[in-house]
Amino acid sequence: MKTLLLLAVIMAIGLLQVHGDLLNFRKMIKLTTGKEPATRYSFYGCYCGMSGRGTPKDATDWCCRAHDCCYKNLESRGCRTKFLKYNVTYQEDQIVCEDADDCKSQVCQCDKIAANCFAANLKTYNKKLRFYNKFRCRGAAPAC
């Protein structure tokens, strides 16, 4: 029981590190993959979850690296991505970002692209990379 509680606390901390609208991002991932994002992607590989480093381990990890880069690009243009709420709808299993505000719309697009990337790479998802030890991530981080 203590192990389960500790795991829940660790996942919550990891999820708090994510920028943007966490609840909408979770819904997007759930819609596109059918999987529970907290257990599947929060600590996957070298880039999913908090603070990525090294060389991404596989296509799913590259999705997370691209997502990080997408947010960094927005931040360099003056968008504040941390906890930025956006409006999104789902029409016929499609994600539709609806904000007129450019930063909100772009954060939504970053999340949408990542969710679709996860879905496109479900077949190569590697369970051994779940809860991967980030200290094992070596090599130079790929440029954005």
UniProtKB/Swiss-Prot annotation:
Keyword entries, A-Z: Antimicrobial, Bacteriolytic enzyme, Calcium, Cell membrane, Disulfide bond, Hydrolase, Inflammatory response, Lipid degradation, Lipid metabolism, Membrane, Metal-binding, Mitochondrion, Mitochondrion outer membrane, Phospholipid metabolism, Secreted, Signal
Active site: 67, 111
One Gene Ontology cellular component annotation held by this UniProt entry: plasma membrane
EC number: 3.1.1.4
Cofactor notes: Binds 1 Ca(2+) ion per subunit.
Pfam name, any one: Phospholip_A2_1
Family statement drawn from the similarity comment of this UniProt entry: Belongs to the phospholipase A2 family.
Protein name: Phospholipase A2, membrane associated
Record organism: Bos taurus (Bovine)
Name of the coding gene: PLA2G2A
